[in-house]
Amino acid sequence: MRLYRDTAVVLRLHKLGEADHIVTLLTRQFGLVRAVAKGVRRTTSKFGARLEPFAHIDVQLLPGKNLDIITQVQTVDAFATDIVDDYSRYTTACAVLETAERLAGEERAPAPQLQRLTVGALRAIAEQARPVEFVLDAFLLRAMGYAGWAPALEECARCSAPGPHRAFHVAAGGAVCTYCRPAGAATPSPGVLDLMEALLRGEWEGTDSAPATLRTQASGLVAAHLQWHLERQLRTLPLIERSRPHAAVEVDLSVRQDGTRDSTTRTANSA
């Protein structure tokens, strides 16, 4: 069996035996890969801290029957150094990793765009170039675009009527016009959907001056839209202060007796 190399982001670790780790990687060419790092928990390990979550690495692997084996590791970016010492950056980066793993799908399904988005988000968090809530929301919106779940923000999600539209409904797919608006649709404050569109497109100019109320509502809608499609909540989002349920935006996901999901998006202005 031939060795192979790839660049990867370390998503998470699991202990294996007394000295090993199972490492979950998001690689550029092969998507999700689970591999064993032998002896990594020993103080004499040749891998050192290079196989910690948030690390961007160049890795050499030996294919195995169930799990590959990591044979060499070189650090490309040591993002963890600037992430783990700050709670906000740490929890935000954890949400990025969890989302990336959930969206990557099956093991060994190539996901180069998702890997690039993940590396870019971790770099922005580590460098503190922008508010972490904007980095996370921009990542989530773009990652949903990669998965085919990007919310409609400029035209009606149901009839494609050009906007701007005021209402937003998660199950409908995003912004909805007056005629298509379902019961329970949210009516976010003016500027919220524009802020989400700017984050999706990477148009950062002016985002820093967005009022806190708009940021909160945008974050709530982004998280709700993602979790509707994932069908269950991300474990890491409740750890992030701005992602907790707010009076401004709250989404109730429930399952009807016929097994279909019901979504009601509420805001302070819900009708």
Curated annotation (Swiss-Prot):
Keywords: DNA damage, DNA recombination, DNA repair. It holds the Pfam family RecO_N. Gene3D superfamilies: Nucleic acid-binding proteins (2.40.50.140), Recombination protein O, C-terminal domain (1.20.1440.120). It comes from the Bacteria. One of its GO terms (cellular component) is bacterial nucleoid. InterPro entries: ARFGAP/RecO, DNA_rep/recomb_RecO_N, NA-bd_OB-fold, RecO, RecO_C. GO terms for biological process: DNA recombination; double-strand break repair. Involved in DNA repair and RecF pathway recombination. HAMAP family: RecO. NCBIfam families: reco (TIGR00613). Belongs to the RecO family. This is DNA repair protein RecO. It comes from Rhodococcus erythropolis (strain PR4 / NBRC 100887).
